[in-house]
Structure formats: structure tokens, C-alpha cells
Amino acid sequence: ICVGGVVFEDEQRVSDGSAARDARAPVISSRPAALLHAAGGAAAVELAESEDVRAWLAGEGPAFAVGDAATDTDLERVAALWHAHPDVLLAGTAATIGAAAGAVAGVGASPRSPRPHVEGPVLVVCGSLHPAARAQVDALVAAGALAVSPGDDPGAAVAALRAGRHVVLASGRPNGDAIAPADAVATSQALAALAFQLEAAVRVPTVIVIGGDTAAAVLGDQPVEVGGTVAPGVAWCRPSGETEALVLTKPGGFGSPSALIVLIAAKMSP
């Protein structure tokens, strides 16, 4: 949520939580306006009330604005105001974009693409080092999935997938607090290469990719058909090319430890 221009997660400023210890891109401020300024943007105004948002959209104030939102109703309110000003670029979390889509499509609109059926076995590819992501893959392995790393012999993973067992392909866990950008890219590419090798050896109906760098490496620059979400923060798409796999992507710092188990169990139900 964002209150007074400050972003909180679990009632804690994000700069005081696990996001501040992210190995790839640690959060250094809980104020988006400050981050915009640090990135070279012009001054940004923080908007607390609907009237503030309405006035800014009408042209009063600097080029950037950060609006408060603590509930879904707040997001819907901001999205409705924004919808009347299509010249303004709206950016935010998946929930923000979802509210914007609702404002554009209208209340009760049906999705253009039906929600897909998640067929097993599932290959999970995780390059994120966020504690939330690691807790999720650990829970799935504890529930019976096979854990493999880029340096492992893929034979065991192929055999597991052929037997209908879920496989978790995850990067190692370095001892240092920070990861160099080049190392992060190399790790993501290694994960993607092994994932491609597994998909070439055995039919993998569903691939779940955790982490932005990992998703970029797995999806590459091929066109993809993005259909929507299967759960909060979890998007689904179907890449073009030889594979027919359903690909789900999710951020590393999102969800409870049981998120993968619940996602797979719920969506594999008839």
C-alpha cells in the first residue's frame, strides 16, 4: 500500500523490509517520488486525496505524480479518474494495472482469453534470490518436487518429468549480499538453457518462471500471447515457436511460502 507517499508491505516500510536486502536491486527508499528523482526524473508530487489526483490530471503540478492507495477501492478510484485522461501514462503494480483495465473494460467485463488449465507435470524455473521466492520453492520441494541446479545432470529431471513429478530448477544461493549484474545475467541464461534442454527432451505442459531476469532469459525476444492472470501477480502467456507450454510468470518477492503449492493444486483441479 502507499500512504502519504510512502510504500508499506506488511505494515513495514519497504526500505526496512526484505526488499532492502535484495541481492539484485535493493530498495533504498520507500518513497517512489524520491526514486523517480534519483533516476533523473523531474520533481514528483505526492497525491493523497481524490481532489489532488483530479487537479493533477487537469494539468496542475509537475510531470510526475505518486498517488496514495491503501485498498482495492482506492485503486479503482484512481483508475476511474485516470481513464478520463488517456494522454497520461499510468504505471504501477499488477493490482494498479488491473484496476486500470477494469476502468477501461467496464465493470463485469469478461476476459478476452479464457483462463487456462494448468496441466502437470510443472517445471518451475527460479533465479530470484528473494526470501519469498526461496521459501516457495523450498516448500514445493518439501512437498515432493525434484530440485535441480544448472550444473546438475539433466537426466534425473527428465526422468522425473516423464514420471509426472514436478521439477524445481533453481540457481544457487551465493554467500554475498549483492550480485553483480553480469553474474545475474549469466545465471539467468544458464537456467534458461537447462530449461530449454528439458523441454526438448520431454513434453513440459506448464512452466512457472520466478523473477524478472529469469523470465527475460526464458522468454527471450520471441513474440508471446499474454492472456491475463491466473492468480494475483501471476501472469500467463503462450510463447510462439516450437513449444506449446503454458508459461506463468511471477515476481520473486510476492506471495506466501505455499504460493506455488496452492497455485499448482488449485489450477490443476477440473
Model-derived features with residue positions:
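Cap/lid and interdomain-hinge subdomains that line or gate substrate/regulatory clefts
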Residues: I1-R77, W82, P270
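General beta-strand structural signal in soluble alpha/beta enzymes
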Residues: A43-E49, A65-A69, L89-T93, G98-A99, ...
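Residue-level preference for the first positions of well-ordered beta-strands
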Residues: P62-V66, D87-L89, P121-L123, G164-V168, ...
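Catalytic cores of soluble, metal-dependent hydrolases
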Residues: A80, R173-G228, G241, A265-M268
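Short, flexible loop segments at boundaries between secondary-structure elements
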Residues: T93-G120, T229-G253
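Redox- and metal-dependent alpha/beta enzyme cores, enriched for Fe-S-associated oxidoreductases
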Residues: R112-A190, L194-F196
